[in-house]
Amino acid sequence: MQFFLIFFDIAVKRAIFVVMEEDLKTAVEVMRKGGVILYPTDTIWGIGCDATNAEAVDKVYKIKKRASNKAMLVLVGKMEDVENYVETVPEMAYQLNELSEKPITIIYDNALNLAQELLGDNSSVGIRVSREVFTQRLCRMLRKPIVSTSANIAGEPSPAFFDEISDEIKSAVDYIVKYRQDDKTPHAPSSVVMLSADNTIKILRP
């Protein structure tokens, strides 16, 4: 009986892995073609695309009906990736990312190699190193940062779970990730800090 349960558990995990791999491949393929996806992150479900593709980013703004002067954050798979998209990564950023007990979004000045629409004042950009395995792999397979913005029309409540996302949003994206659609685990929003090149920190959200 115990052997059967172990075998069954392995089979289930393998099935989940296969489904996840197909999900990842499809999502990456869609983004490489300039498409927009709906996907789970380490906080809430988000709308995403290749953050270096200006046309794809523009699609996200249109789907959300979001003002073009409002910046959006991006996700990367590991801290070292930040160096490709920011002129100077302050030493403090590595410490904050390592020591923070919850997901942390760091706003840096002088962004590089990203769609201009994503940037705020001083060419600033919010970047978070994802702590969620699916999103980490998504970033690594795409080899680009991914836009992450809540899956709602601007001004409406941000959905905490997949089944709270409106049909309007679901029908507007090019691909909906299957992974974690039934997950009801609550996820806290990320901390948000602004970090200057001289390591000065301003906490925007604890």
For the regions a protein language model found, what residue spans apply to each?
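Intrinsic disorder/low-complexity segments
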Residues: 5-6
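Active-site-adjacent structural elements in enzyme catalytic cores
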Residues: 9, 13-206
